[in-house]
């Protein structure tokens, strides 16, 4: 693990390599950033398998990529309200934190897939390759948004799992 400085009550580091997750029940997109939180890159798309195999994947990923913390996309409506998918993402984020033992924050993922599709289309890839990469690029867009929000605010963005309830609006996040 890299040396990290903790700044949040949930143990989320102020530096160190982050990984973002675009959670889905079939595929999970993953992106990572450098330890200084400057550049985010799509890493891969993980096909969802059994809970045991998925756990081993994320444990191995955290170790091999020296991940200090996770950012999990939270799908919410344009008005800030949550959906059934939001509950699934919250459950996954709690599972990821428990499984890997790493701090995990939720961050608004509105429009990340739209932005990812636009980004991929600029590269003139085939439809098949677009479908294969869109979740990883959506995770990259999510991580870029998280990093930018942290820089803009001068503090951590998103919500830690403990203070985030499904009744609140995330427009202020």
Swiss-Prot record:
Keyword Lipid metabolism attached: no
Family to which this protein belongs: Belongs to the YqgF nuclease family.
Matches recorded under PANTHER family: POLYNUCLEOTIDYL TRANSFERASE, RIBONUCLEASE H-LIKE SUPERFAMILY PROTEIN
Keywords associated with the record: Cytoplasm, Hydrolase, Nuclease, Ribosome biogenesis
Subcellular location: Cytoplasm
Pfam families, alphabetized: RuvX
Gene Ontology MF terms: nuclease activity
GO cellular component terms attached to this protein's record: cytoplasm
Keyword DNA-binding among record annotations: no
EC number of this enzyme: 3.1.-.-
Full protein name: Putative pre-16S rRNA nuclease
SMART domains, alphabetized: YqgFc
Function: Could be a nuclease involved in processing of the 5'-end of pre-16S rRNA.
Superkingdom of source: Bacteria
One GO biological process term: rRNA 5'-end processing
Record-linked CDD domains: YqgF
């Amino acid at each position: 693990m890299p040396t990290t400085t903790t700044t949040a009550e949930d143990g989320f580091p102020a530096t160190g390599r982050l990984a973002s997750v675009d959670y889905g029940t079939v595929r999970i997109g993953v992106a990572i950033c450098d330890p200084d939180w400057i550049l985010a890159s799509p890493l891969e798309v993980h096909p969802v398998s059994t809970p045991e195999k998925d756990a081993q994947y994320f444990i191995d990923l955290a170790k091999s990529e020296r991940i200090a913390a996770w950012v999990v996309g939270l799908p919410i409506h344009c008005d800030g309200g949550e959906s059934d998918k939001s509950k699934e993402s919250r459950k996954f984020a709690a599972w990821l934190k428990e499984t890997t033992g790493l701090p995990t924050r939720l961050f608004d993922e509105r429009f990340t897939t739209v932005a990812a599709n636009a980004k991929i289309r600029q590269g003139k890839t085939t439809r098949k390759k677009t479908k294969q990469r869109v979740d990883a690029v959506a995770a990259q867009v999510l991580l870029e948004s998280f990093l930018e929000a942290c820089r803009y605010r001068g503090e951590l963005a998103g919500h830690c799992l403990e203070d985030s309830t499904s009744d609140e609006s995330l427009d202020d996040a």
